[in-house]
């Protein structure tokens, strides 16, 4: 086959590409966290940070080109009942990068710019995607997958970097940032509860999402891992000391659900693979960020409670994350080299 020209790549550029930035970023952050126990991990963690920053810039070129040169194609994807859910991976990637730059460098200004830009774009995408879905009649139970979590539930990612960044703000700016964090966490958490019920309804009462959408099973782990950590980050800056114990209990409950869902997602994925229902696609990056969110939650919980069991489960999940990330990266590189990954899906 003839390798596609850049204009064609940009015209059909899938919005889900930035799931690669999300997954690589969370691998960098969790590896850096483990470097506290094993200092040798500090160097690969830093390498992942810089690689991911470059990856975002590289992917942003065709993404922005599509909006500038092919706005009709971009808007058409925005109204697609499945593909539209992946547009907010761009804004979530910015929020993850903000956490990276705050963790790996002393460039607080860069982290702040990335965070505010990510916050602004994610609010826009969450309203735009859900507006089309709520107003349209094209969405059916066949279109319901955990990918529906991304636009609204992605709001809970804001306090991951937004909480720690509050110490670098003061006055009205700090109050507005705190307010934005609270809105994001509140809206995303409540939307997760509603969407969780809808996705479980499909699993119980309708045919499962196989094939290209098989990895979306793992997306459940993202809010399970992020919500408690974001809540703890926010409580660090609120005059609610008694709420920390309740938040810790909530984290424990979410973590328990996460352990259970990790096993279930693994079993469902292996079952799909056994019958040839796991073809490679960009959706494989959906394995990485959710699993990384669970790793971060496990390590956070182990530090707060002093539980070695949570730490070892987190390390085991981190090792699995590393394997899945490497496999997906290599398969993606091969697909990019052949041009196959730029063939649009219906």
Annotate the PLM regions.
Residues 75-83, 99-155, 160-185:
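Membrane-interface helix-loop-helix junctions at boundaries between adjacent transmembrane segments
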Residues 1-64:
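N-terminal signal-anchor module of multipass membrane proteins
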Residues 26-33, 93-102, 156-168, 224-238, ...:
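Hydrophobic alpha-helical transmembrane segments in multi-pass integral membrane proteins
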Residues 254-257, 311-327:
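Small-residue-rich transmembrane alpha-helices that serve as helix-helix interface/gating elements
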Residues 4-23, 76-84, 131-155, 184, ...:
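Cytoplasm-facing juxtamembrane segments at the starts of transmembrane helices
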Residues 117, 151-265:
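Generic multipass alpha-helical transmembrane bundles of integral membrane proteins
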Residues 37-39, 171-178, 237-247, 272-276, ...:
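Extracellular/periplasmic helix-loop-helix junctions in multi-pass membrane proteins
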Residues 40-108:
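Membrane helical hairpin/interfacial module
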